[in-house]
Structure formats: C-alpha cells, structure tokens
C-alpha cells in the first residue's frame, strides 16, 4: 500500500528497497522526490517501451519498475462449448453470440465475482483498452499520474465517455444484474465446476485450477468492440529504491544488485505460481507459455498487455459506479458523471490518531538482543492475547516502529498483510522448547529461517541460538532469567501463516486452538479501542 510507504517517508522510515502490489503513479506521486531515478539503468532499458511508458513521470524519470505480469482475461469451460456445439469466441460479436447461445440451454454465458473492487475496476478498463491506450488515452493517463499536478484530475471527455458506453453495452449483452454483485470467487468457481457457467473474468491461474480438476478450460483475451484483443495485466509487484542510497555508494551497489536479481529471469520464474505462465515486461526474460495460454500467444507477442490504472481512487470509485451500472441504477452518461465527480471531490476525511509512539525503534537485527521493533510488537501482542509466552514468525511485522501518530489504517500496517493467524495452546516447558525449536530451526513442510533477520521474535521468554552450517540451532530457553522447567505449564500464542504452522498442527496429540482470526484484524481492533499503548522492547535472543 503506497499510503504505508508515504507514512514511513514522512516519519523518516523509508526502507532502501520498497515493493508495492496495488500501484499507480498517481498514488506514488508524493514519494517521487524520495526515490532514485532508474531511467538510465539496464533494468529499465530492458522493459518494453510500451510498458515503461506506464511508469514514466512527466519529466521522463522512472522511479518504479514492474516484475512479471499476472494476466487477466476470460477463463472459459471449453468442454461446455464443445458439448453444446458453440464456437469459442474470437471477437466481441462471437463472444456475445456465445452468451446468447448458452442462454437458450439455461446456462449463463458470462459472469464474474463483482463483489470485489478489482473485478469492477478491471472490467471497466479491460473493455476499453484500445481507447485507453490511444494517444488521447495516454495523454489523459500522464496528466492523471503526473506528480507535478497539484490539482485533482478528472476523467477526460473523449476516452472515458466511450469506456462507459462500452461497459453499458457489455452489461446488456451479458445479462449482468444486481444479483451478480453478491458473487465471490468461490461462487463463480462452483458454477464453472457445475456446468452452470461458461465464462468468467479472472486470471490465467483459473485455467490451471480447473484443468487440475479435470475440466477442459482455456484462456481468452478481452475482445475490444473495435476488433482488437488485449490482456489485462497487473505486475506481481513494482519495485523502487530510496534516493538516500545515492549518499552511500556501497549500499547503492548492493541495492542495485538486489534490483538486478529481482528482475532476472530466474527470480521471475520463482515469483509466478507453480505451473503458471511467465509473462514479463522485460526483453531480458524469455516468454514462457504453457498450453493454457497458447490461445493468447499472438496477443502477448504483439505486446498487447495493458497495465491497469490501479490508484486507490480507481479501486473504490469503480466498485461504487460499476456496481450501480450493473444494478441498473446508472446509465453510461450518469456513471461517467458520477465517476468524474468522485475523482474531483475534495478530501474531507481526516483520520483520527488511535496510537502514539513517543519513541522510534529500529528493525535492524542485533545478535545480542534481537530486533527492537519486533520485540515491541511481540511484547504488546502478548498482552493483547493475554498469554504467558508469544512466538512470532519474523514475517509477522512490517518494519520499524516509528516515533509518530498512527491512524487506524497506519496501525494496521504494522502487521504484515500475509494472512497472519494466531494459534494458542497451554503446554509444558518441554513442549514449549520444542515449539520454539520448530520456529528457530524450521522444518521441510513449514518455514526455515534463512538469515538472522528471519529468526522469530519471542516475548515472555529469552532464547539462545547458535548459527552453524548456514542454519540455526536452539541451545537454550529461559523465563525470568532462569532455565525453563520441563514440567512448568504456560499459555503460548504463536503468530504464523497457516503454511508455517502446518507441521505443528499436524500433531493431533497437542492441538492448538485458533487459526480462524487474522492477527491484523485483532491488532486493528486493539489499536482502535481507545487505550492502545506499546510495550517496551526486551533483549529476547542471544545469537552465537
């Protein structure tokens, strides 16, 4: 979330290397002067110009670069088409014909999970990529994203009216209605499996998931009403470097090495899901298409991979306006006017401070003591969960605790948005030692620490760890400065993702409770409660 990095930057806590998933130059504008210009780097030079243009500032500088793409289009049940003798769509007209043909058999031709903001937003843009990629469209996008613009930029009167007309026609041609606004991803997949739905809007990963279940599926592009074909894409993440690196040539060289690796072919192959196609924006990365995406190879080879406009405003306003169009409340003209008005509206909401930290704590790991900011969070959360001991995987927290006032959203951002869960159990000292060992030494099916910074943070106990042969070994656990008695009983809360906890949860003889509430939600509720306070850090680890 770019708001998170803006908050860090305003309080002197911007990291050297930052990544972001939901991204737009519009939202990144406040960070521009704090980021390195990457325009002259080899990594930027390798990005196809058609895509690099989406990341260029008005002055030609480039602060962010994209890694590989997640492609979105139409996932189709090809077996259903063959069963009813309906040709696969090759353009917009045949897409509409297919929808009508399926309707005669009592099958929905197209639907999607319109309960989500991104589905609303990407449908609006995907149907009009040709218009948005035209000279007029690029001109508007540059103005909307320009960091130098001090005034709000609304929709233009050329490209966007046509986009809403295209969406209005699509809603009519596919029969979308108010009932579709309640559908989530699982609802759509269930209908695909049951033969009740022929096509939905989603990522190429959906083709593999259906194929793994024995369903003959295919992936098709967006069909523009002008005859062109496009894929909607979103980078798995964007990466930027802090301008502070320019003051330290050694750190800058290391950061550039990290950037080089992030954008390498090997790294991008590791980013995509197993079996998913690798679609890169870089000329240095080979195109790798599985059978699932062979139908869209010509689209990819034409560089018809549109990078969505993904500002916070576009997510929220698209959800509101597109939903109202689907529900029949807005015409194309009314939707255009409503969207434009919301883009131009003044920001009147002032978020309330829910948490104040008078001190700042670094997230640098020290062999004698650990990570001060992680200790603050672990100690505070131990109180929140009313537990004797808390063990937190290293990827539980986002970074330094800043000396700043936190709003509810900023406080929530102190917890990693990775589905972190809380698990609780009463156990003996001996069992606690083995639980800590699992976090420190790792396991094949869970998570294994790979450097000092990835060791867990603990609260209510202190641990001794030995670093050897590229790994770590637990050598001691103390509580209140004394060795932990094996028969002492304590309540223990573990913070970890479901995958990290899987090996511990596999032992039915020592069941954990919980795993059904996200730590981020619990922390947000605590911060918003009116009496939130941060605990002091402690020396929780000695690494030898």
Where in the sequence are the language-model features?
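Long, aromatic- and glycine/proline-rich binding clefts that accommodate carbohydrate-like moieties
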Residues: 217-220, 270-324
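Extracytoplasmic/periplasmic substrate-recognition and gating elements
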Residues: 84, 211-274
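Conserved C-terminal helix/tail region of periplasmic/extracytoplasmic solute-binding proteins
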Residues: 82, 297-353
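Glycine-centered hinge/linker elements that transmit conformational signals in sensory
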Residues: 143-181
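Hinge/lid segment of periplasmic solute-binding proteins
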Residues: 21-72, 87, 96, 122-123, ...
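Extracytoplasmic/periplasmic solute-binding protein
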Residues: 63-65, 96-152
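Catalytic centers of hydrolytic enzymes
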Residues: 351-544
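Extracytoplasmic "Venus flytrap"/periplasmic binding protein-like
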Residues: 1-50, 79-90, 190-191, 198-199, ...
């Amino acid at each position: 979330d770019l708001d998170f990095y803006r908050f860090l930057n305003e309080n002197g806590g911007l990291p050297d290397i930052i990544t972001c998933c939901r991204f737009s130059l519009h939202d990144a504008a406040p960070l521009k002067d704090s980021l390195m210009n990457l325009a002259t780097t080899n990594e930027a030079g390798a990005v196809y110009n058609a895509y690099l243009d989406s990341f260029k500032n008005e002055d030609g500088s480039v602060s962010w670069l994209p890694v590989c793409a997640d492609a979105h289009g139409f996932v189709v049940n090809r077996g259903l088409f063959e069963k009813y003798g309906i040709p696969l769509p090759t353009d917009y007209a045949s897409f509409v014909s297919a929808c009508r043909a399926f309707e005669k058999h009592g099958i929905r031709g197209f639907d999607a999970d319109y309960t989500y903001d991104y589905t609303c937003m990407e449908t609006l843009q995907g149907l009009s990529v040709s218009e948005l990629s035209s000279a007029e469209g690029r001109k508007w996008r540059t103005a909307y994203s320009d960091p130098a613009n001090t005034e709000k930029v609304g929709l233009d009167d050329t490209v966007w009216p046509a986009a809403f007309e295209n969406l209005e026609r699509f809603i009519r041609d596919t029969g979308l209605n108010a009932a579709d606004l309640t559908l989530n991803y699982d609802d759509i997949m269930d209908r695909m499996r049951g033969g009740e739905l022929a096509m939905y809007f989603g990522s190429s990963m959906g083709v593999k998931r259906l194929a793994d279940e024995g369903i003959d599926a295919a992936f098709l592009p967006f069909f523009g009403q002008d005859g062109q074909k496009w894929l909607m894409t979103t980078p798995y993440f964007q990466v930027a470097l802090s301008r502070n690196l320019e003051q330290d040539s050694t750190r800058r060289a290391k950061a550039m090495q990290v950037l080089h690796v992030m954008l390498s072919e090997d790294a991008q192959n590791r980013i995509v899901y197993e079996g998913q196609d690798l679609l890169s924006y870089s000329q240095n990365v080979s195109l790798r298409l599985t059978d699932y995406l062979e139908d869209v190879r010509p689209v990819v080879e034409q560089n018809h991979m549109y990078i969505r406009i993904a500002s916070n405003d576009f997510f929220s306003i698209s959800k509101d306006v597109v939903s109202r169009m689907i529900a029949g409340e807005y015409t194309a003209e009314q939707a255009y006017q409503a969207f434009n008005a919301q883009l131009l509206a003044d920001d009147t909401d002032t978020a309330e401070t829910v948490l104040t930290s008078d001190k700042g704590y670094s997230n640098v790991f020290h062999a004698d003591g650990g990570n001060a900011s992680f200790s603050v969070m672990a100690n505070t959360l131990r109180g929140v969960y009313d537990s004797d001991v808390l063990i937190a995987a290293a990827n539980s927290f986002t970074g330094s605790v800043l000396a700043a006032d936190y709003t509810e959203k900023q406080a929530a951002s102190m917890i990693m948005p990775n589905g972190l869960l809380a698990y609780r159990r009463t156990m003996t000292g001996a069992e606690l030692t083995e639980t800590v060992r699992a976090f420190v030494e790792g396991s094949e099916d869970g998570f294994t620490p790979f450097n000092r910074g990835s060791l867990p943070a603990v609260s209510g106990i202190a641990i001794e760890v030995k670093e050897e042969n590229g790994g770590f070994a637990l050598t001691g656990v103390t509580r209140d400065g004394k060795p932990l008695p094996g028969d002492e009983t304590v309540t223990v809360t573990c913070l970890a993702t479901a995958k990290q906890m899987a090996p511990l949860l596999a032992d039915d003889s020592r069941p954990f409770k919980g795993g059904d509430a996200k730590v981020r939600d619990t922390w947000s509720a605590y911060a918003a409660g009116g009496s939130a306070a941060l605990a002091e850090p402690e020396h929780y680890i000695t690494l030898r």
